[in-house]
């Protein structure tokens, strides 16, 4: 039995680590046709508030930092004033990786695990959060994902160059959860290497670390277009 197996076994029997959340809502919503997706309303409340409320009421999450645009810091602070787990609302950086790093810096010293969440995934559930946090507690890094339904093509110059086996493909969602020190180190290395990363898992993967995949939720969509927003509203109506 190797040391990694022993370490993972010990993690599984220890109490759940103190987990903070960084909710990233600092984008400019360029694909939303003039709609500010951070403040877009779903069932009468801004999308960021709905996302934050789910983390506020999830037992696995102990504290929250929200990262947003400078013009939204005060409005979001007021909207989330009732959420006692929200410890800070901070201004984001030039890109997602920098914004996540700024959020990590605002967490308390108690935090050992961190869940990084897209603010634009307002239909996240306690079940997915809890499942991912527990997997990260055991493995050090975890993310929810769902199987890809469409056939995916790799295209170069407008011509198909290959077709990956669909059975090996998963669409990764958030929250992506990590040991805090692991994610900090991974983001720093990506920054030092000037590497382009598309999500937080990518930074960790670059260091040769494995990310545990857990069952995601088809309804945990990311709202990036007006059509996505319309679908999110329909899904919420369906819940009533």
What is each residue range found by the language model?
Residues 123-214:
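Conserved core of the sugar-phosphate nucleotidyltransferase
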Residues 73-79:
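Acidic helix N-cap motif at the loop->helix transition within catalytic regions
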Residues 60-65, 87, 140, 219-220:
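Short active-site oxyanion
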